[in-house]
Amino acid sequence: MVNPYTPSQNIIWDPSSLSDARLKTNLTEVTSEQCLNTLRNIKPQTYDRGDLGNERRLGLIADEIEEALEKAGIEVDNVIGQRHWQVDGESDVYKTLQYERLVPLLIGAVNSLSARVQDLESAPKKKRNGAAASKPV
């Protein structure tokens, strides 16, 4: 496969976005709470990328994502990867992060927070209805 990353263009193209249920086996649900707990342990940061001319960037740290997924009990093989990269003339293996593969965590966390908001919004109504029903006539 041709390397989908072109450093000079900063473009990532992933030709393997197939998501048909017929291609998936051994499905395991990741709960909304697991998603929320994972995101709680991730800190967006700004940083300088020395290998790209000290360009100031916003992003995540692959090591933190890896640790947060493990802490939440989520086992995946396709979020954190590795790539040989050359920095200051020396080649080494560095961790990579597939940002788009974090989207399911965002969806799960939004579902969790949405359920909490609904519970909080319905709580005052329940109290008002309960208080009205308990007043003497």
Identify the function of each model-found stretch.
Residues 1-19, 41:
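Trimeric beta-solenoid/beta-helix "fiber body" segments of extracellular/virion adhesins
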